[in-house]
Amino acid sequence: MFTLISTSDLQQLYFDRISKYSCTVTDDNYAVFEKNEHMLILMSEIENNSIAVFDLYKKEFIFFRSGIKHKTRTGYDNDNKHLHQFYAQLHPEDIGFVLDTKIKLFDFLTGLPPTERNNYNLVFNFRMKNKEGAYCQYIQRQMVIESDNEGKPWLVMNINNLLSEQSTKLTLQRHLVNLKTGKFHLFNNELEDGATQLFTEREKEVFALIAQGLDSTAIAEKLFISEHTVNNHRRHVLSKTHTANTIQALVYAKLLGII
């Protein structure tokens, strides 16, 4: 469950971990990353999201690009390279949750064998200020994209997707998914009944078909189940993702790699 440690103590814990962390990189490592920057720019524009890459060696963001439309773009941009500037943009009620999530992920990944550290995708939500100073709801994916010469995490990519322009109170949630197995880790005690999967196989099937544009009647015919059963699966997914509508639930499912 979410820790009861104060936000100020969490900040101290998190920044201590970052400042004491060491990795070994060379100019050649940076040259390889710079050659691939254009791919991140293209991905941001196509997927309408913002992408930031944090350098655990330099202790700062070395890349930022936003394809999110101007009105809802975050107040975080290329001029803000340091972590404390990112956290200054978060909703005060969400800062502790985000810090706790990052600390637990950091400890989890550094305890894994080097060959497994790039296999995980963290997905969590929060509220952040946009350019106009209003709070919007975002979902962030975080993953290690490059390791140093000793196999230790070096570059961490954060991808923010706009979930809603409304800053109403939201249910904070986080999921760590193994991209190879599809299994959930670390925050399983926060899932219903201690499950290792957020959705059942049937729920995945239903939402994959919804993502293709099929309505409940067509899905029922395709899966040989009743329309009532399809609608029940819809409601279960909305409940599990704590989302307000099918579109938001689809965003979650996509970012978790389920559809």
Task: Label every model-predicted segment.
Residues R141-V156, S164-L170:
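Short loop/turn elements at sensory-signaling interfaces that couple input to output
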Residues R202-V206, S216:
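The N-cap/first-turn positions of alpha helices
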Residues G213-Q248:
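Recognition helix of helix-turn-helix DNA-binding domains
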Residues D28-Q85, L179-F187:
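PAS-family sensory domain signal
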Residues I46-S50, I103-F124:
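PAS/PAS-like sensory domains
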Residues Q85-L109:
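PAS/GAF/H-NOX family sensory domains and closely associated sensor/linker modules
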Residues P113-M143:
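Per-ARNT-Sim (PAS) sensory domains and their PAS-associated C-terminal
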Residues L179-R202:
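Regulatory hinge/linker segments at domain boundaries
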